[in-house]
Amino acid sequence: VMKAKKIIIAIPTDFPPYGFVGTDLKPQGLDIDMANLIAQKLGVAIELAPVTSANRIPYLQTGKAALVISTLGKNPEREKVIDFTSAYSPFFQAVFAAKSMPITSFADLNGKSVGVTRGAIEDQELSRVAPTGAEIRRFEDNNATVAAFVSGQVQLIATGASVAGNMMARNPQLNAEYKLLLKDSPNFIGVAKGEDKLRLKVNEIIAEAKKAGELDRMAKRWLGRAAGDLPQ
């Protein structure tokens, strides 16, 4: 990378607010901000390579990209084929509602209606922790769940960070905010096996960005909450 003075970073363009194509047809989002930050700190030019969930790991394995910054969660299967840096951003399922609604614990959901997408991770987690007095209303897909919350059919919504970030950006009039965490599964940057020098350098950049508050700023800008403590 340093020799070529250029780094190719794989990013999502179909997953707002982490990665999407803006009105100017340029990729933008949290993952794109992170990619630009890394290239800037390495002092090299950047080439963004759009990937999907299916081809992002093959891009690393075949050397088409040096890094994958694409809402990548860490699990044992993936660790067999690629390496990971420290975590750089939160990815989470949570309960969101209007700022004016006082919700500080799951007990506060008593007597309230919560919209959720049937069978999604947040449905499973919510069913586990919600009090019996909460009315959980299930919808067939994320669009239907969001529509129910936006139109006021339900008072709260339980969904993933990306869906919520997108919803809040499109509907500022809702004045919605993050209320309760259901599940945390942070994002890591993927690096090809054997690229230890690059991996350690990126870890240094992540650690510095964390200390400088840059990771928190990025998460607040795109997800509505600070990055907080992320796993190494």
Which ranges hold each PLM region?
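Immediate post-signal peptide segment of exported/extracytoplasmic ligand-binding proteins
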Residues: 1-26, 102-103, 107-113, 232
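Periplasmic-binding protein-like
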Residues: 89-97, 161, 165-207, 225-232
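Short helix-initiation/N-cap motifs at beta->coil->alpha
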Residues: 32, 47-58, 137-151, 183-185
